[in-house]
Amino acid sequence: MNATRKTGTWLWALLAAAILTALLTATAFAGGNDFRCWTVDARQWTNQGYRSEKDGVWYLFLPADESLADTVLSFSGSVTAASAGTLDREHGTLTGAFAASDRVTLTLDGGKTVQICAKQSSLPSLRLTLNGTTLEQVHRDKNVKYPGNDLVVTDGDDVFTGTVEFKGRGNSTWREYAKKPYQIKFSKKTSVLGMPAAKKWILLANASDDSMIRTRLVYDAAEQMGFPYVTEYKYVDLWVDGEYLGVYLIGEKAEIGKNRLNLQDPAGAMFELDNGFATDEDHYFFEGRLNSYFALKEIVEEDDAHIAQAMSNF
């Protein structure tokens, strides 16, 4: 596939995904009548529904590989009628609601109606089930690592399962935005969505970029211009414990390694410009000409002599 066609393909997929994320950004669980809705698919994965504060519609964000026609909608609260599908009031379920349309209207006790809209994108799906913790707990400290979490990645008919360590990452992107970036780590080098195998992978939220294309365009341009060590990323829809978090970029963690930044010099090092947290690192310095702090993130040979040499070379 040529570069132009490849770029066009993911741009169309991303456009649809961006619409879903824009809807999600405006949503929150509604209070009041205690109505909630969710689905449980064939793999027993739960997908929570969200109520948009803009239009009052409840949205379900479903993986690309889930059949809308076979989706079983569950709900809390008393539902007396549905505009489509087979309603089971006793068990609080609605079967076949989205067989002909992506929208269904439910009538609640008292005559109030709620509209539910099911949405999907064509992006790969990445689902995490946390073990012994919650997303709220993870958000309290980005540095705490939580092992033993179940990961499922689906891309069309391809399904990958594994166990990963999960943690937060980032500096200003972690502090300033509700949509957080994360890191996952496998126990051994693992390929994700066809990218070169590695243990550590990052999930970029792109919270400050509503278009969600700036990062990808920069890396695609760098690759086409022949720059070495260009980070590879792919778009995914991310769920954690059934909560849809939006569109993320999963990609290689910037680190020294054969399939990453392949440095051979013992004093070969990777520094990060970091005016917010550099002084929290073990090794950092201030560059007066740039009026910026730089932190040593990684070095080939981690001993005092090579660290001193690397910082001097910089």
Set out the residue ranges of the language-model regions.
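N-terminal module-boundary/linker segments of secreted carbohydrate-active enzymes
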Residues: 100-104, 111-156
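Internal "kinase-insert"/substrate-recognition segments embedded within catalytic cores
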Residues: 190-191, 205, 227-229, 244-314
